[in-house]
């Protein structure tokens, strides 16, 4: 049994060759790094590295107070990694990566299907050489199907996958979710797939290929709305903040702002109506049960809204919490991240950097009692881990000026 004082991550000793960029793949490899894996992030010197390094402002300052190559977007999914400057078209760099692949447990990439074949870094080639390798490919539409060669960004995946048709006001246009949820969810599915493949390898010695698509992940994330359609044949519609299967479950206006109220069962509805002074509503057959309330949503919600508008946000939250009815505020991001609850849960972490001010990023929400997540490496500057990788592989080159010049960042 592991000693409680052991602070090694659960994935300590795992080596990851990360050929991904933007958000989906980096989300996955950041999670693996948080859990203790060593992640070597490969970045192309000809393009200045990961595209998201240039997705700013804002940028973290360097030691002189100027913008560094760490955009906030890049920092959101790249802590805990070591950046390696390597051009896949360069034979020497490619040989370096082949040596790394030979020692890696996991390779993850998000090139277009077939894009790595010309470099001999595709899954068929590497898995044939290294049968225990777990190789994860992320693309917009997957390795098969009529759309396999189309590019895929988060916004496109939200559109193709149907989630935008559900998001927004009933009389408004389709809207994307406020953050890159297709990318993030795809990265989480990739993490799950990799851990499952590693478990299989532990049992059999066999690696395998994981084929994951942004659009597939987005469609899987339709959850109840997708199954509502599959069961009823009726396409779901945009309903703002309302719930397709529960009423009342929405954002409501108080006298001084907005609150969220989520009445999940009939007993909660009785207590809710007692608070708003409408004890008559649960006695009305149209509203007595959730299925009835769902049918008569349009008749119920205006009455609820009128009653709630007489109260302040604080009174609604205090009154419903006392009655054990789910209720909460609609926080801004500053309010959410600087709340007492967020501080108690380490929702943000500060990471020290050499010769530059520390950066503050979002923390990992996992709270593991024996193998806590690690927040010990800040997001890397471009190429800062190149020599460390060469040392680890036993082939660091000293005083090769031409090679050093070749890997300077291109702006």
Spans of model-derived segments:
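N-terminal helix-loop segment corresponding to the beta1-alpha1 unit
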Residues: 1-193, 197-203, 377, 381, ...
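Short Gly/Pro-enriched turn/cap motifs at secondary-structure boundaries
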Residues: 65-66, 74, 239-244, 249-250, ...
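Aromatic-enriched alpha-helical interface/lid elements that frame and gate functional surfaces
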Residues: 247-323, 327, 399, 410
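Glycine-rich beta-alpha junction loops
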Residues: 46, 141-142, 214-219, 256-258, ...
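Short, surface-exposed loop/helix-turn segments at secondary-structure junctions
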Residues: 53-61, 229-237, 339-353
